[in-house]
A protein has these predicted regions:
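SAM/dcSAM-binding transferase cores
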Residues: 172, 194-258
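Conserved Class I S-adenosyl-L-methionine
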Residues: 140-144, 166-187, 201
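Non-catalytic substrate-recognition/targeting regions of SAM-dependent transferases
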Residues: 2-12
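Short proline/glycine-enriched turn/loop segments at secondary-structure junctions
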Residues: 188-192
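The AdoMet/dcAdoMet-binding core of the Class I SAM-like
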Residues: 19-152, 161-166, 175, 195
Length: 258
């Protein structure tokens, strides 16, 4: 953790910037509201894998429909550091709907009851070290089982400028798992991440044989939160626009799809 003149407090893990006070909201608002606002019915139960800085929890807790939020974070040190140095992000940990589970996210998803969650959000680091399993087939198969029909998964999906091969591999794998559903890539802009862009892979589980396309917002944006203030990035218009990719990326990700 260090203090930056331009970006405020900065959290770094293994030499990689994870969040800064100045621009973290663009990532947090999009990774939460893209999946939750795409649902046909408001979410009641959500699982967060990773997300120990608390930013995802903060944005989730804006949603009044939520009854319970589980978070599985493997590194308790991240939670403690965020509570001490980034309290504006960590405020979600104090919400009574939140249950914190320190441990392996893959194992937590494996142990979840079938169809238990409306949405699963994976706020992971890059696919190296302990986070590598969160980009592999067994994890996505477990998430598919753990969400209800009509539910949605949203994972940190890397950058089209740096990791297009990984994105194609993950989206192709997900289409084989979420058959009858929909798999899409969306992105947000965030200056302090490499290339200034980071994406999300969104997968929906078929209900009655009908795919739920995640690029259409069906739920309203959450109301202003008295402690967090209004949304600063997400809008319904930006929701739709986030799925419109540059030609080179759209071409690569469309290859092999019907």
């Amino acid at each position: 953790m260090f203090e930056s003149t331009s970006f405020g407090r900065v959290m770094v893990l293994d030499g990689v910037i994870q969040s800064t006070e100045r621009d973290e909201f663009s990532y947090q608002e999009m990774i939460v509201n893209l999946p939750l606002c795409a649902l046909e019915t408001p979410a009641k139960r959500v699982l967060v894998v990773g997300g120990g800085d608390g930013g995802v929890l903060r944005e989730l807790c804006r949603h009044p429909s939520l009854e319970r939020v589980d978070i599985a974070e493997i590194d308790e040190g991240v939670i403690k550091a965020s509570k001490e140095f980034l309290p504006h992000m960590a405020k979600g940990f104090s919400d009574p709907r939140v249950r914190v589970h320190v441990g392996d996210g893959l194992q937590f998803v494996k142990d979840a009851p079938e169809g238990h969650y409306d949405a699963i959000i994976v706020d992971s680091s890059d696919p190296v070290g302990p986070a590598a399993v969160l980009f592999e087939r067994p994890f996505y198969e477990c998430m598919h089982r753990a969400i209800r029909p009509g539910g949605v998964v949203c994972t940190q999906g890397e950058s089209i400028w740096l990791h297009l091969d990984i994105i194609k591999e993950v989206t192709s794998m997900c289409r084989g798992i979420f058959q009858g559903g929909a798999v899409s890539y969306a992105y947000t802009t965030i200056p302090t991440y490499p290339s200034g862009q980071i994406g999300f892979v969104l997968c929906t589980k078929s209900r009655d044989g009908k795919p739920l396309e995640p690029n259409e917002p069906r739920q309203p944006a959450p109301p202003m939160d008295l402690s967090s203030g209004p949304l600063r990035y997400y809008t319904p218009e930006l929701h739709r626009a986030a799925f419109v990719l540059p030609a080179f990326a759209a071409k690569v990700l469309a290859e092999g799809t019907s």
